[in-house]
C-alpha cells in the first residue's frame, strides 16, 4: 500500500490499477474486515526531531519543527471547504470512528489545521465526505453512546452540556469501573470531543455530510445530508452562490494551512 503515500496526481498507471483493485476489494468486504485490515497496516513514521531540556524551550523547538513539516502556504480563504474524513484518529485505535469522532475530526482537527486564519470564510460551508454510520464500540466508547443518543437530541449547546451533564457522566460508577478496569475512555471524554469542535461550529455556517448512509446521524449532529459529493456541492452553491470559491483539503497527509 506504499503507493497511497503519494499524491494521486503523481500516480503511475500501475498505481492507479492497484488503487482501483484495492477499492473494488474493499467494497466487497464487511466493514469490520475493512477496518481490521487497514488498522493492521503499520504507518511509515520516522523521527523528524529530538530535543531535550526545559519544557518551554523544547516546546518552542518542536512547534517550529512541526510547522516546518506541516505548514502549506495558502493565499485566500474559500467559501466552500471539502474534506474527506479518514478512518483514523487518536481515539479509535483498533476501534470504530463513531459519529462523535467523525465530528471531532471534521470540526476539531481538520477545521483547526490552520495558522493565522481558517481556510474557510466565516459563515462558509464545510462539506465532509463520510458514511456517518451509526456504530459505536461498547468496550472503548460506552459513554459516547449515551451522550449521542440521549444528550444531543436535547441540546447541542456546549455550555449547557457542560453545566448540566458533564459531572454526571464523570461520576457515573459504571463508566468509572470500565475506565479503571476495562479499556473504556473516561465517562466525560465525549464532552471534550464535543468541546473540541466548538470553534468550528461557531465559525461554519453549514455542514453537509456527503455520502452519509443515513439521515439521523447528520441530523443529530446538526448537519445536512447529501447522497454524494456532486449533490453536496450543488447544495453549498445554493447557499454561497455560483461563484463561490471551493477548496479541497486533502487529509491525510497532514497539512496545516498557513494562511496569508
What are these regions (language model features)?
Residues 79-84, 127, 247-248:
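Structural motif
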Residues 88-92, 134-138, 215-218, 254-257:
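Flexible loop/turn segments at secondary-structure boundaries
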Residues 95, 102-206:
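C-terminal catalytic subdomain
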Residues 194-260:
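Extended hydrophobic packing segments that form well-structured cores
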